[in-house]
Amino acid sequence: MNIALLKSKIHRASVTEARLDYVGSISIDEKLLQASGILEYEKVQVVNINNGARFETYTIATQEEGVVCLNGATARLAEVGDKVIIMSYADFNEEEAKTFKPKVVFVDENNTATKITNYEKHGSIF
């Protein structure tokens, strides 16, 4: 049996752009992708903290510092300045799942990584 677990998370990133006339996806600063362990073209779930919207798309790396840009139809699901959580998941067998820890990247208002952990605590942003 395989179990899907949180693999990587970029927490409370600010949407910097929303481009409706684009093929699709979410463009993310390549430094954030590297810090989180999310790969380019990897499927991600995005949760908009401001309006509760949840959607899936794939990532595109950009060299533009601090960029988190919703492309195509997903541009309708957030406004510039909205806070989002970007998550990827992976399947593990039961033994792997018992010891696996996700990579969680916390960012500031400029989408610069401020803290990287491998855990989350109930009731705490950090």
UniProtKB/Swiss-Prot annotation:
**Cofactor binding mode and count:** Binds 1 pyruvoyl group covalently per subunit.
UniProt-annotated binding residues for substrate: 57, 72-74
The record's gene field reads: panD
User: What subcellular locations does the record give?
Assistant: Cytoplasm
NCBIfam families referenced in this protein's UniProt entry, alphabetically: panD
Active site, per annotation: 25, 58
Highest taxon listed in the record's lineage = Bacteria
Instruction: State the organism named in the record.
Output: Campylobacter jejuni subsp. doylei (strain ATCC BAA-1458 / RM4099 / 269.97)
Q: How does it assemble?
A: Heterooctamer of four alpha and four beta subunits.
What InterPro entries does the entry give?
Asp_de-COase-like_dom_sf, Asp_decarbox
Q: Which cofactors, by name? A: pyruvate
Key word Lyase present in the record? yes
Q: What is its EC number?
A: 4.1.1.11
PTM characteristics: Is synthesized initially as an inactive proenzyme, which is activated by self-cleavage at a specific serine bond to produce a beta-subunit with a hydroxyl group at its C-terminus and an alpha-subunit with a pyruvoyl group at its N-terminus.
Q: What cellular component GO annotations does this protein have?
A: cytosol
This one is known as Aspartate 1-decarboxylase
Which pathway does the UniProt entry assign to this protein? Cofactor biosynthesis; (R)-pantothenate biosynthesis; beta-alanine from L-aspartate: step 1/1
Its job: Catalyzes the pyruvoyl-dependent decarboxylation of aspartate to produce beta-alanine.
Pfam families recorded for this chain? Asp_decarbox
Example of a GO MF term: aspartate 1-decarboxylase activity
Biological process annotations from GO: alanine biosynthetic process; pantothenate biosynthetic process
Which positions does the record annotate as the modified residue Pyruvic acid (Ser)?
A: 25
Q: Which UniProt keywords are given for this protein, alphabetically ordered?
A: Autocatalytic cleavage, Cytoplasm, Decarboxylase, Lyase, Pantothenate biosynthesis, Pyruvate, Schiff base, Zymogen
